[in-house]
Amino acid sequence: MSIKPLGDRVVIKRLEAEETTKSGIIVTGTAKERPQEAEVVAVGPGAIIDGKRTEMEVKIGDKVLYSKYAGTEVKFEGEEYTILRQDDILAIVE
């Protein structure tokens, strides 16, 4: 079984946040800032606008930066994912 997003939605898996600051302080649990970098694991077919399907700009495997509070968090087969709209993705990291 897999997650297949609809329309212009994208499924991402957050990359782990740094656990140590640049100055060497170890950050725990609630003090960690929510990461905004993720890997794309599934991509919808694109939104339909004026009867035409739009092309998606991201693809599976892309590393992306996304809006801090965007999307809906879901748990699927023991893993945590976020489903968001392509518009909530700010950039592709190369």
UniProtKB/Swiss-Prot annotation:
<dbReference type="InterPro" id="IPR020818">
    <property type="entry name" value="Chaperonin_GroES"/>
</dbReference>
<dbReference type="GO" id="GO:0051087">
    <property type="term" value="F:protein-folding chaperone binding"/>
</dbReference>
<protein>
    <recommendedName>
        <fullName>Co-chaperonin GroES</fullName>
    </recommendedName>
</protein>
<keyword id="KW-0143">Chaperone</keyword>
<dbReference type="InterPro" id="IPR018369">
    <property type="entry name" value="Chaprnonin_Cpn10_CS"/>
</dbReference>
<dbReference type="InterPro" id="IPR037124">
    <property type="entry name" value="Chaperonin_GroES_sf"/>
</dbReference>
<dbReference type="InterPro" id="IPR011032">
    <property type="entry name" value="GroES-like_sf"/>
</dbReference>
<comment type="function">
    <text>Together with the chaperonin GroEL, plays an essential role in assisting protein folding. The GroEL-GroES system forms a nano-cage that allows encapsulation of the non-native substrate proteins and provides a physical environment optimized to promote and accelerate protein folding. GroES binds to the apical surface of the GroEL ring, thereby capping the opening of the GroEL channel.</text>
</comment>
<keyword id="KW-0963">Cytoplasm</keyword>
<dbReference type="GO" id="GO:0046872">
    <property type="term" value="F:metal ion binding"/>
</dbReference>
<comment type="subunit">
    <text>Heptamer of 7 subunits arranged in a ring. Interacts with the chaperonin GroEL.</text>
</comment>
<dbReference type="GO" id="GO:0051082">
    <property type="term" value="F:unfolded protein binding"/>
</dbReference>
<comment type="similarity">
    <text>Belongs to the GroES chaperonin family.</text>
</comment>
<dbReference type="GO" id="GO:0044183">
    <property type="term" value="F:protein folding chaperone"/>
</dbReference>
<dbReference type="Pfam" id="PF00166">
    <property type="entry name" value="Cpn10"/>
</dbReference>
<dbReference type="GO" id="GO:0005524">
    <property type="term" value="F:ATP binding"/>
</dbReference>
<dbReference type="GO" id="GO:0005737">
    <property type="term" value="C:cytoplasm"/>
</dbReference>
<dbReference type="GO" id="GO:0051085">
    <property type="term" value="P:chaperone cofactor-dependent protein refolding"/>
</dbReference>
